[in-house]
UniProtKB/Swiss-Prot annotation:
Similarity comment text for this entry: Belongs to the UPF0434 family.
Name under which the protein is recorded: UPF0434 protein HNE_3545
Listed Gene3D superfamilies: 2.20.25.10
GO cellular component: cytosol
Pfam families associated with the record: Trm112p
Signal peptide start and end residues: none
Native species: Hyphomonas neptunium (strain ATCC 15444)
Amino acid sequence: MSDLPDQTPKDDSVLFEANGVDPRLLEILICPATRQPLAYDRARHELVSKNARLAYPIRGGIPIMLEEEARDLDDTEGTAGGGEA
C-alpha cells in the first residue's frame, strides 16, 4: 500500500470543464490519427487536431478520442485562434 496521497480526480469535470482544460491532461493526449498534440477549443468544447483536420468532442467531461466520432474541420477552422495549446 502506498503512502502517497491519491491524485485521481473525483469527478471528470475537473479535467474538462466549461472554463478550461487541465493542462496536464492536454500534455498526454494525442490525436489517434496523427499521433500529434491536440489543442483545446474552449468555444466548441472540443479537442482539435490541426494536422488531421479533426475535432474530437468532449461529452460529460470525457474526451471521445474516436475518429468516427470526430467532426471534420472546414477550411476556416484549425488555422485561426480559439484554441489553447
